[in-house]
Amino acid sequence: MKFVLLFGVFLVTLFSYSSAEMLDDFDQADEDELLSLIEKEEARAKECIPRFYDCSHDRHSCCRSELFKDVCTCFYPKGGDNEVCTCQQPKHLKYMEKAADKAKKFGGKIKKWFG
């Protein structure tokens, strides 16, 4: 029984050591790959599309507002057959930005009173 227990501890130790070595090798490979990608990276920042402008050609390049990114929303106007897509801010995000702005102002007042 003691032999089986010692053999099991030996196997667990050996397995943990070998897996740690493999993880170190993977981490080094990931770092090298990341560095090569950073070196090859080109400037790819495009101009963002302002709110209420057409975004049908690129739905992921809407501009950011103060806190959140605008969303490309598509709809059919009344009596029209063509789909229109524009960058818009969803109402719930608009209300969240207003609440955050009021909280900032209130925090500034409290800081002024006690600071």
Curated annotation (Swiss-Prot):
InterPro entries: Spider_toxin_CSTX_knottin (IPR019553), Spider_toxin_CSTX_Knottin_CS (IPR011142). It is found in: Secreted. Disulfide bonds join C48-C63, C55-C72, C62-C87, C74-C85. One of its GO terms (cellular component) is extracellular region. Its main location: secreted. Residues 21-44 form a propeptide. Residues 1-20 form the signal peptide. The presence of a 'disulfide through disulfide knot' structurally defines this protein as a knottin. Belongs to the neurotoxin 19 (CSTX) family. 01 subfamily. This is U3-lycotoxin-Ls1i.
